[in-house]
């Protein structure tokens, strides 16, 4: 019997015609933008860069999709009234505009968090101050050699959220996760690997404990 991802099917029903914000036009969010367009969501795109700093190909795609676009330092002034907000890892959840929307009832999440929530396969998450990429890559290769179908993602590999319709329960997902991706995440991978912890990025995190 063909496997059907019930969580994904429900999510796709929930977002149809809903107001969704995508903050940050980065590598992981472009496939997400394509996916949301395909699923007929009402999408607004936000980016701290000025419009002339965005690639012409991306701008043409957004125009073709008829998405609302907000660029520049004050782009988040227009962030209000959304059902769901996808933030890029570089857009910290501590930003007042995001906190205000969350208090209002919006779901503030990331592509990675939604992937883990709806993934039918076991997820192995690798984080730490150093050695993440090496550990993640080696883990994926070892599991592949053992005969598993492995999807490699997170900070490396490909954005996996749009692959959810392909992933089967017997597969394995290996993710490299940064501290920024883990901030405010309310779900854990099935297996968590921490390479080490040192006081990095304290210019961004409020303290070592965070």
Pin down the residues of each PLM region:
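Phosphate-binding loop of NTP-binding sites
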Residues: 76-82, 89-210
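N-terminal leader/targeting and accessory segments in enzymes
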Residues: 1-110
């Amino acid at each position: 019997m063909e496997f059907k991802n019930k969580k994904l099917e429900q999510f796709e029903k929930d977002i149809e015609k809903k107001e969704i914000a995508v903050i940050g036009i980065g590598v992981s969010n472009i496939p997400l933008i394509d996916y949301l367009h395909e699923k007929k969501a009402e999408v607004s795109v936000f980016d701290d860069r000025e419009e002339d700093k965005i690639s012409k190909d991306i701008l043409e795609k957004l125009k073709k999709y008829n998405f609302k676009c907000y660029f520049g330092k004050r782009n988040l002034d227009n962030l209000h009234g959304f059902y769901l907000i996808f933030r890029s890892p570089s857009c910290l959840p501590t930003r007042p505009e995001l906190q205000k929307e969350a208090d209002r009832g919006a779901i503030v999440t990331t592509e990675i968090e939604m992937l883990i929530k709806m993934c039918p396969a076991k997820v192995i998450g690798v984080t730490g101050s150093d050695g993440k990429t090496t550990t993640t890559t080696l883990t994926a290769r070892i599991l592949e050699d053992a005969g598993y179908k492995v999807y490699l993602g997170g900070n490396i590999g490909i954005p996996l959220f749009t692959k959810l319709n392909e992933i089967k329960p017997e597969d394995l997902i290996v993710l490299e996760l940064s501290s920024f991706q883990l901030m405010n995440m309310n779900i854990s991978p099935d297996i968590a690997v921490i390479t080490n912890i040192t006081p990095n990025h304290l210019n961004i995190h409020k303290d070592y404990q965070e």
